[in-house]
Amino acid sequence: IGYLNNGEIKKANSNQQTGLTSFSNGTIVGIAMDLDNNTVQFYINGSSTGNTVSLTADKFYYFGTSGYSDAEHQWNFGNGYFGTTAVSSAGTNASGIGIFEYDVPTGFTALSTKGLNL
């Protein structure tokens, strides 16, 4: 499943949603995966975009990846940095685990060993 920079959400190479917020350099894309209910919600600069998308429940592995020619991609799983740049606003996080640029959606926490047992 992926959120493309032109505002499309694709799953298994099939459009799930189109006409959503597009993005370019400097955009922060947030991903909230709910593996109890098998859904994912995307966020653009802290605001949800589109509807939640259903995930396949059984026998799938999910991993983060990004790609675009001649582009640099940085991930923050709660350490408070994108590469060597610290987040500027440190949004709230109900679990107190992780530092993010924007507020973490209710019921979600950092993808880390500390957040697995909540």
Regions picked out by a protein language model, each given a short descriptive name:
Residues 1-118:
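PRY/SPRY (B30.2) beta-sandwich protein-interaction domains
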